[in-house]
Amino acid sequence: IQCVPAFVLDAVERPEPLDAVVDDLETRADAVDHFEFYWFPHTATALTKTNTRLPAGTATRPLTATSRLVDDVLVGNVVHQSVCSAGRAAPGLVPGINRLSARVWGDRTFSDASHRVFATSRGVRFREMEYAVPLENLASAFRGVQRVIDENGWHVEFPIEVRVAAADDLWLSTATGRATGYLAVHRYWKVDPTAYFAAVEEVMLVHGGRPHWGKMH
């Protein structure tokens, strides 16, 4: 196993205008160590996460226990579970709920050991599909997913995750031979994801996508 020395991550999580983030994806990815964002369908907001590596031993500013409880447990799990249940019972509520979710999630700055920043607790059950596309195709692929959601009138209650990674030299890696953008779509486990995932998969394949082997595809 190839490992690196322990390190600290400085994390900046904030909402930003979606179009500006998508239009500048490659530049944002090249400028920092780790960049990703979440997008709740039916909103115009990207919930960005920018992580910068710092040497081990750097003084940290970790989240307080109260902040973790409110953000990660109450909002990220308890409230989101209620939101997903409500969206399944009344799909027409989803756009409004998503707009509210985009306003209350993802606005904080902190630093801590990498494993405390990267890892998050997920208590809401879901199904997921993720594809890896060449980084230069990521913005177009994302726009394609937006289009299929709009064209089909789907009310999607779970956010889409977009992240980037450097090229790899391992044959079985989804990033082998190319800088890569990852696009993951999710549905609440009580919602049939078949049509949504199939439509997204068509978009990914057009953009040179490779499926994540451990997820639905």
Question: What would you call each of these model-derived segments?
Answer:
Residues I1-H217:
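Noncatalytic alpha-helical scaffold of FAD-dependent oxidoreductases
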